[in-house]
Amino acid sequence: MRWDALFNDMESQLAEADRLSLEAEIGERTRAELVAIELSDRLRGVLGCTLGVHLLSGESVRGRLAHAGAEALVIDEDWYQVLIPYPAVARYVGLGRLARSEPSVVRRALGLAHSLRALARDRAELSISLGGSTGVTRLEGVIDRVGKDYVDVAAVTPGEARRSRHVGDVSTVPFAALAAIRSRKHAGL
């Protein structure tokens, strides 16, 4: 009987060691998988859901998440779409745990400049929030030109076409200063 008890005890200890080893491996694999998840993947997990976005500038945007790209996201508000570069965001409210990677290589390659070029091509009237240490500054106008890391915004009279006689001035804005770019929904993003 003593031998049976000894072998049963040893068997229980080995089973417990195997269980602990398996739990440790599962924990390690979970941590390794989490390291590979990008913020844009988490955002894609809540596409179509309501999301609150608090910007570093102090401004807040709340609406339906319409797109999560490589460098920016798009929020649908009632009348506007808001393009927000990821570096302008301080925090998100309503972001779930689900993550979805972008399967399209082409979509993964599309960055902020591509979205801004589409707005420039459409001559969309925009309200651009610039973030900084002094708070939010707004520019109203049309994008004239998009460079590698900057955008030229022509201030135009609201409702007027972008013609030289309607342009007040042209501001060159580094991408790093962009906090939010609002366009009317019908203009498309």
Identify the role of each PLM range:
Residues 1-62, 66-189:
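Short glycine-rich, low-complexity segments
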